[in-house]
Amino acid sequence: NLIQFGNMIQCANKGSRPSLNYADYGCYCGWGGSGTPVDELDRCCQVHDNCYEQAGKKGCFPKLTLYSWKCTGNVPTCNSKTGCKSFVCACDAAAAKCFAKAPYKKENYNIDTKKRCK
């Protein structure tokens, strides 16, 4: 679920940036998404959005699905092995790892999405 996803982000980035900093970034980080991603981090969010969309097509509710995971050496690892729990956990873990690798550019936080995300 979204709280677990936030915790995964903290795991992967070693707590260097609050999870909420990703909630309004670029064209895809946060609710919805459109246009061309503004950078590598925004692309991570686009991939995550697409993963959640695929989960929805499988009959899952990714923003609400509780799963089992652990943080080992700043790497989120899924314990859930089947069904929606496994699928959603994999979406979140991949995104958290992607976020940790991508540069965070403050100028892409809280952008005017109407102008920049066409």
Curated annotation (Swiss-Prot):
GO terms for cellular component: extracellular region. Expressed by the venom gland. GO terms for molecular function: calcium ion binding; calcium-dependent phospholipase A2 activity; phospholipid binding. Its cofactor is Ca(2+). It holds the Pfam family Phospholip_A2_1. It is found in: Secreted. Gene3D superfamilies: Phospholipase A2 domain. Keywords: Calcium, Disulfide bond, Hydrolase, Lipid degradation, Lipid metabolism, Metal-binding, Secreted. InterPro entries: PLipase_A2, PLipase_A2_Asp_AS, PLipase_A2_dom, PLipase_A2_dom_sf, PLipase_A2_His_AS. SUPFAM superfamilies: Phospholipase A2, PLA2. Its EC number is 3.1.1.4. Disulfide bonds join 11-71, 27-117, 29-45, 44-98, 51-91, 60-84, 78-89. Binds 1 Ca(2+) ion. It catalyses: a 1,2-diacyl-sn-glycero-3-phosphocholine + H2O = a 1-acyl-sn-glycero-3-phosphocholine + a fatty acid + H(+). GO terms for biological process: arachidonate secretion; lipid catabolic process; phospholipid metabolic process. Transmembrane segments: none annotated. The active site is at 48, 92. Belongs to the phospholipase A2 family. Group I subfamily. D49 sub-subfamily. PLA2 catalyzes the calcium-dependent hydrolysis of the 2-acyl groups in 3-sn-phosphoglycerides. This is Basic phospholipase A2 PA-12A. It comes from Pseudechis australis.
